[in-house]
Amino acid sequence: MRRVKEIGGVAYKFVSPSNRGVADRLVVLPQGVVWFVEVKKEGGRLSTLQNIFAAEMVKLQQNISIVWSKEDVDDLIKEMTE
């Protein structure tokens, strides 16, 4: 996620072996802002566990986004910088 670096952040590939369904990327931005980002190809779908994880993060008031296309990435970067 080169675009994250351009806005001063770091994107980590996130793997949690004992917790299937977690987001693909953990994006850390300045001022303590953290995003969980699930990257899907167009036409892909979220698994049941990914949906559960996303709902859990929303319930915990965490930043989470699912990106399906370059346009989604552009929109997310814009949201991250607002």
Model-inferred region functions:
Residues 1-82:
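Catalytic phosphate/metal-binding cores of nucleic-acid and nucleotide-processing enzymes, i.e., regions
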